[in-house]
Amino acid sequence: MPRNVYGMNQSEVYRNVDREDPKAILNGVAVTGLVGVLRQLGDLAEFAAEIFHGIQEEVMATASRSNQLKIRLQHIEATVPPLEKAMLAQTTHIHFAYTGGLEWHPRIPITQNHLIYDDLPHIIMDPYEECRGPPRLHLLDKFDINGPGSCLKRYSDPTYFRRASSNLSQGNKKFQKDKKHCKMKKKKTSSRSRDMSRLASLANQNARKTFASFSFSGQTSSTKTTSTSDMEKRYDFQDHHSRSFESRSGSGYNECLSTATSSLKTGERPKGVFVSSSLTPGSCTIASVLSECETEDAHDNFQFSPSQGQAARGSSCVSWDEKAEIVESLGLQTDEASEMVEANSVVDTLDEKPSYGEGIGGVDFHSKDNENDKSESGLRKRAGIDEVREIKNGREIVGEPRDSEQETESEGECFVDALNTIESESENNQGLQTSQVSSSCGVADERLEKSVCEQETEQNSYSVEDSCRSMDGLMANSFKNEENASSENVSVEMHQQNLQAGSDINRLQKNDLCANKDMRNDSGGKDTITFTFVPGLENSLVDSSNPLIHHGLQENQETEAESSGDLEAFKIWTNGGLLGLKPSKPPVLAMPSSLSPDCKTEERTVGFAEAEKDKADDLVENASHRHVLNNSSLATPGTQNPGSSNGIVMGIVDQRESHETSSGVFGLSHKFLTSGFRRKDSFAHDRKTVPATIPENDEVTTERRRFCDQDINEKTFMDPFRDEAPIDWITSSPPLQHMKISLNPADTLQASRLKLKFSDGDNTYNTFSSFQLLPETGTSLPDSYSDDDTFCRSSPYMSDTDYLSDNHSLSNSEPWEESSDSHGRKEQELYDSFHESRHVDNNAEASPLGIKSESSCVAVNLSYLQNPAEPLPPPFPPMQWMVSKTPSEKMEDKTQSLQLQEALRFAFEKHISLPTAKNELPSMVTSAPKPEIKAHLKNNVREEKQSANAKETETGDFLQQIRTQQFNLRPVVMTTTSSATATTDPIINTKISAILEKANSIRQAVASKDGDESDTWSDT
């Protein structure tokens, strides 16, 4: 408190008074001092309020908490005494070792906290008290038409934000869709204008051909000029537009083509027309004839009548000249008349020229009747050879590169509507699989077979050259056979392989060609030559700009019905991969029986090198592709199958399905055994598969069965266990080789011990390795020296650590090898097989010392000539466990008997070398065996006599008893030190004394058994 309280106020209060009036001066001074005191008290009050802020609240809370704590403490005091009484009343505490206290202590469940109150601390509660309230949305209610409280309700309602977010996402999707539509429309417009300029410049190209006029059904098309140099560049784009045209127009050009077929009379037949399903890779089809501009406009202007649709469904076969008429009629309705004139010329040339597929599609050559003269056939022959030469000359034109990368991107933009495109393709496949047989007049119409195979010409140019050579010979042979009217078989072998290098696995393509030459003279005298090509497996990882699409589109309805009736589904027996076991029966593959028996097929299997072994996905991928049949399947044609009528061509199915089915079946049989169902694959019964190139013969069946067996015995499955286990299918299990389970009862005289024994060291990484619990005798306490346990307790030097340090046994794998026939074995042999060997030290040769009498009645096991640190053998088992040994164990007994004899000879030489050994023997040994021991021995001898009367034991049995039974006497105490040898080597003397004493016991047992009760001992 400041001394001058008057200075805290203004001095004018008392200075401005009248100096002559002292009373007024004193009053002013008093008021000034009072004001200063009051101001100072106010400051003190504020300071005290800051210091003692909330102290009263804290005091009240502390008092309340202390009261609650006192109540809880009373509860604890009432609960603890019963627990303490129960704890002190327990006699054993062994059960505490089996409680999960180690895991319980770190995670103490807090059910009720006795020391801390439920309220949060003030340091946590203060931020909640000091935070601001909700936003003052009520200020916006005056701008809302719903009245007061509407803004708070609106902005706190979760549905409002849900609706707002959904509207925003819908707006974004609509904007993106409109943008993509505009971009696609722009690309289509530019592509159409570019194609119009391409078609306009067709006549100015270098590779031009002039074709003669062609007459069919009274209609003649004029001579045109066209070029095929630029077809490969635009092939992908034209094929796409043809598909889109088909999907938009309903059924595609099949409907319009059916009109010409229905107008064709039954008796009429085209003259000198060869039908080809596909041309060279650079050639054009009916889809390429229709330009993109016409395709875009035709779906808006062209309408199909219902009668035409019905005719399309009813008709099953049309020819290229009929398509020419329809295409010409369509071209007249459009604005691009000049382009369509050139397109019609291309179709006319297709009708005039005898074309064929160069290893890509299916080709049908339909010859005329036998009434046609040889000149006409010779013309066809020369025309076919000329066509081959023209195709050879046009190889370089075909191999021209594509336009640019921008064009490829624009083509990729056209595949936006993928779902509709796929649906239209499936409809076209169903619509194009048509064939018709005119059985009324015996006239076979031309069958339409369309196979579209788009491949990169740069990669497969060599296949075109090989195809030309092989087809050149094919044309010559076919026409030569026609002239000579013979049924000579035509063999065509075409190898086409397209290797795509992947990151982890190799992908293979296989092209199979099954050439069937069916020479049959029917009532009309007509010859039919059929060549059917099945495309190879589709590579699934190629770019979309390089579509390798193989469609086999010709199927005969009758052949399909016959083959579907004979085909059996694939059958697989499996246990679902339970515990890694193999199926009880191997996978059985049912081969189709509807194919021609004359066809022979080569099947080659290319095994893939496994990629990184630590990647399970790569292993599964390799397993699924391991069984793909590679290279070529060469089918030798023969006479027609008698089961097929009217010379119908055998149906072709897409080869991709057969390859996927075979790889799926073998892959599933492989994956059932390794990692379960890792990959979703279609089963065989879910697919309609008619593998036309795989005949049913013994070679194929044997080959496939060999593949199946080879994969079942795969090296990755059971290599470590083929030689050890009786079967190849051993389940895997966690490594338990370090575990030892032992059971030692403490209250039994002859305790049994169960040990966990493994078969061998190869089962380290198995999940469930096989093991056996083998009985062993337990050891009693080493300080028990009573006469009752003299012959049943083990050596005092024996301990559990010695069991661990022991080599488990010499025959560690014998019980494992004999586990298959162990049902007839007895429990005693398990005991015997695990007590065949003892530990051998490097310093001294330790082996049991055995003595065998002349009568071969008793053999016992003596202790080691070893230092006390080495373990001694366990006590002998009960008499009922002593059985004869197996032949394998008898061979080991012979070797160990020789060691016993050498050890015995060594011991007696040591004993004879001692000068006073026999004289001081009574003084060295404390006492002879007591009568109780002798009585016990006599009882044992009596039991042995009874067992000997029942069955005469063999020599190996006695040697086994030497190893298994042991008479442990009391420890020998040295009582004299007069012998120099005993002083220098007390250990040997102690051992020799023990040996002699035990030998005396043996002598007594043998003498009592033989009837000789003399106590004299002879070394012989």
From Swiss-Prot:
Binds BRK1. Interacts with SPK1, ABI1, ABI2, ABI3 and ABI4. Residues 167-198, 351-382, 802-827 are annotated as: Disordered. The lineage of its organism: Eukaryota, Viridiplantae, Streptophyta, Embryophyta, Tracheophyta. Involved in regulation of actin and microtubule organization. Part of a WAVE complex that activates the Arp2/3 complex. Regulates trichome branch positioning and expansion. Residues 802-814 have a biased composition (Polar residues). Residues 365-382 have a biased composition (Basic and acidic residues). GO terms for biological process: actin cytoskeleton organization; positive regulation of actin nucleation. Keywords: Actin-binding, Cytoplasm, Cytoskeleton. InterPro entries: SCAR/WAVE_fam. Residues 174-191 have a biased composition (Basic residues). Residues 954-972 form the WH2 domain. One of its GO terms (cellular component) is cytoskeleton. Expressed in expanding cotyledons, expanding leaves and expanding siliques containing developing embryos. Detected in unopened flower buds. Reduced expression in mature leaves and mature cotyledons. One of its GO terms (molecular function) is actin binding. It is found in: Cytoplasm, Cytoskeleton. Activates the Arp2/3 complex and binds actin through the C-terminal VCA (verprolin homology/cofilin homology/acidic) domain consisting of a WH2 domain followed by an Arp2/3-binding acidic motif (A), separated by a conserved linker region (C). Binds BRK1 through the N-terminal Scar homology domain (SHD). This is Protein SCAR3. Belongs to the SCAR/WAVE family.
